Amino acid sequence: MLLVLLAMVACTSNEKTPQATEPVQEKPVQVVDNSPRSLPLLYATDTCKIGQNYYVWELERKACDSLGVVADDMGDKYYDNTIKIVVKKNASTLFARTFKKSDFRHMLDKDFFKNSILDGCRFMKIHEGMVSFSMAVSYPESDMSRPFILNIGPDGSYMILPDDDLDEEYITDSLSS
């Protein structure tokens, strides 16, 4: 009889009492955005008078999804950019062109070309009818860049040259973030 009583006590002590259930808290899911980044659209313009001539220049940098994507060392992806330059002299268009990184291909080594984007542009000066801009092709969000000078002649012709004498004042340029 003692055995039956112990069995009953043992069975009744294992009964679960109803407890208030806590609401299930869902852990926030971190969404990883793997889409390519774009440098911000930038626009700059200015005017100047040299002698009897009035010059107006406009620069516009914008990301272009049709130019391909470049990945940095961390795996972050970036769209390449185009830079549009318009120069007017006495209200007539002297020069208008949209540049892509491929315009600099012959002056970049293969690896740098593959991993860089067209990054910045800045008006430099007008001297003896020549309008000059500094431009840069660089690794995205990096200090690694290749500077260039764009010279636009009085007739609207242009030439791109490597800038071997980069002046520090041109590093933070008009169209660079």
Task: Please report, for each region that a protein language model flagged, where it lies by residue.
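Sec-dependent signal peptide recognition
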Residues: 1-4
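C-terminal motif of bacterial Sec signal peptides marking the signal peptidase cleavage site
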Residues: 7-10
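Short, low-complexity, disordered segments immediately C-terminal to signal peptides
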Residues: 12-31
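Surface-exposed acidic loop/strand-edge motifs in secreted or periplasmic proteins
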Residues: 29-123
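Beta-propeller blade signature
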Residues: 81-87, 148-155
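Short hydrophobic/aromatic-rich beta-strand segments that constitute the beta-sheet cores
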Residues: 95-96, 133, 159-162
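Acidic, glycine-rich flexible loop segments
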Residues: 107-147, 153
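Short, low-complexity, Pro/Ser/Thr/Gly-rich segments in the mature regions of secreted, periplasmic
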Residues: 156-176
